[in-house]
Curated annotation (Swiss-Prot):
Protein name: Trafficking protein particle complex subunit 1
Major site of localization recorded for this protein: Golgi
SMART domains: Sybindin (SM01399)
Matches recorded under InterPro entries: Longin-like_dom_sf, TRAPPC
An annotated GO BP: endoplasmic reticulum to Golgi vesicle-mediated transport
Matches recorded under CDD domains: TRAPPC1_MUM2
Top-level division of the source organism's lineage: Eukaryota
Subunit structure: Part of the multisubunit transport protein particle (TRAPP) complex. The heterodimer TRAPPC6B-TRAPPC3 interacts with TRAPPC1 likely providing a core for TRAPP complex formation.
Keywords, in A-Z order: Endoplasmic reticulum, ER-Golgi transport, Golgi apparatus, Transport
Pfam families per the UniProt record, alphabetical: Sybindin
Organism the protein comes from: Homo sapiens (Human)
Family label: Belongs to the TRAPP small subunits family. BET5 subfamily.
A GO-annotated cellular component: endoplasmic reticulum
Amino acid sequence: MTVHNLYLFDRNGVCLHYSEWHRKKQAGIPKEEEYKLMYGMLFSIRSFVSKMSPLDMKDGFLAFQTSRYKLHYYETPTGIKVVMNTDLGVGPIRDVLHHIYSALYVELVVKNPLCPLGQTVQSELFRSRLDSYVRSLPFFSARAG
């Protein structure tokens, strides 16, 4: 099992942070364009799920998968979106995404007066702690294959 990449978006679609670990194929477009496409897809899926679901969707959509990867999604009440792409063998990771938001982003970025909100995260401490946390996950594989 493995982690491919992670996106962190604000409520307006600004990509606050992007990391990758075992991404085998690049999108072939500039990163800014990739971020816009990802956010647009998330917006569309979220809207579709909320309108088409036969049941009340308390948590909205949590994940979707293709034949090659699984996208995990977590949205906070303030509209911050945490997205992690993994391989298909990874089960639900809502608690992992919540931890990334609450213990890393909120503690190291939001509560840091030197980190302006609504802009790309420049904190090296956030980046290194995020990297360490993701690498410590039981489904993170040093040998993605």
